[in-house]
Amino acid sequence: MNTLSNKRVISVAVTGSWPTKADNPNVPIHPEEIAQSVFESWQAGAAVAHIHVRDDEGRPCMDFDKYKRVVELIRANKECDINLNLTTSGIGGLDDDLRIYPLEQLRPELCSYDCGSMNWQNNAIFENHPRFLERLGLACQELGIKPEIEIFDTGMLYSALYYIK
């Protein structure tokens, strides 16, 4: 009988929310770099790739065409069966439609589901309005996407339990 006591899932965020090439010259910025880094992570044992994209200057963005290119490049490699997890980032006051659209079009296996709002370090507000959380939860159910429930403080635990119901 298999037990979960000896099972592990390695998830990588090769670009992450904030790192830049100034922070680390190896941070993948362009879709080709991101896809290559995901493939190398899969070869090393990663099962999930949490995808963020950057604009041409290397700043975090939610540009659908960038997401589409990254996903297409990863899925074009037929030997790589890594599960894709697209961020639904709440940084920068993004429109709810813009945050959900990549999920509808690209159908990843997972997406981030950040269970509340918070101050992000000293430079941004990470906003996840209850209206958005409800809409995202329904979209996950309708699209068959598993939410990666992210909890950054104890209050978010209660939000997660509320939306799971």
Residue ranges of each PLM-predicted region?
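Active-site mouth loops of central-metabolism enzymes
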Residues: 14-36, 87-96, 122-126
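Acidic (Asp/Glu)-rich catalytic clusters
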Residues: 3-5, 42-43, 75-79, 100-109, ...
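Conserved, mostly hydrophobic/aromatic
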Residues: 34, 41, 52, 111, ...
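Glycine-rich, proline-tolerant flexible connector loops at the mouths of alpha/beta enzymes
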Residues: 22, 47-70, 120
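Alpha-helix-loop-beta-strand connector modules within alpha/beta enzyme cores
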Residues: 12, 59-86, 134-142
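N-terminal small/glycine-rich loop or linker at the start of catalytic domains
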Residues: 1-26, 112-119
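Extended substrate/RNA-proximal surfaces in nucleic-acid metabolism proteins
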Residues: 93-149
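Hydrophobic faces of well-ordered beta-strands that scaffold small-molecule active sites
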Residues: 10-14, 49-51, 82-88, 109-113, ...
